[in-house]
A protein has these predicted regions:
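Non-catalytic, usually N-terminal nucleic-acid engagement modules in DNA/RNA processing proteins
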Residues: 1-21, 27-30, 34
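Short, active-site-adjacent cap segments at secondary-structure transitions
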Residues: 24-28, 98-101
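Extended two-metal-dependent nuclease catalytic cores across DNA- and RNA-processing enzymes
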Residues: 37-192
Length: 192
């Protein structure tokens, strides 16, 4: 995997698109009504900027995509897989930690807030596992920023430790009775 701190490869993309979130409610709210329910409204001075960004994208005739009922993350992940299937490489420009699960060969992540490409070490430092296992870690630990509950008492660090030991969430749940720590074992079994 290419671990570069340079942004030189961002300067000449062959294709690109600006991906927007749709309205606040998405299909995830149909699955889990409290999804992102803890989010406060954006600051008043930020709200008008959303429309300015959309207008700027339109004024510069930049390709953009948004789809009702979907978040930008969903669209980015879908387009990434479609592009990889065609044998092309992908660079995602975003500071969203949830997109780290897309990091792999031929997919680079550039964090504009940190002005650097995300490396495999960055992913492991953040989640304690490789990108393919992030979803298992988040399933166990939950995601407070999205108001998604996990197993009580299991944070990212313990979730990563368990996933690294048992390889997948499914295997962990199948072998939960083998967990040595009584409280942890009981909590995971109770919350299957």
């Amino acid at each position: 995997l290419e671990d570069s701190k340079s942004d030189k490869n961002l300067q000449k993309p062959t294709h690109f698109a600006v991906i927007f979130d749709s309205a606040r409610k998405t299909f995830r709210n149909e699955i889990y009504a409290d999804y992102k329910a803890n989010r406060s409204e954006p600051p008043d001075d930020l709200v008008p900027q959303f429309e300015y960004i959309r207008k700027s994208v339109l004024a510069f005739n930049l390709p953009s995509v948004d789809l009702i009922n979907y978040e930008a993350d969903d669209l980015i992940a879908t387009y990434t897989e479609q592009i990889l299937a065609k044998g092309a490489k992908v660079t995602i420009v975003s500071s969203d930690k949830d997109l780290m699960q897309l990091y792999k060969k031929d997919v680079r992540l550039y964090d504009p807030m940190k002005n650097k490409f995300i490396t495999s070490k960055d992913v492991i430092d953040k989640f304690g596992v490789n990108p393919k296992k992030i979803i298992d870690v988040q399933s166990l630990a939950g995601d407070s920023s999205d108001n998604v509950p996990g197993v009580p008492g299991i944070g990212i660090k313990i979730a990563a430790e368990l996933i690294n030991k048992y390889d997948t969430l499914e295997k962990l749940l199948d072998k939960a009775h083998e967990i040595k720590q009584n409280r942890r074992r009981e909590t995971i079994i109770e919350n299957k």
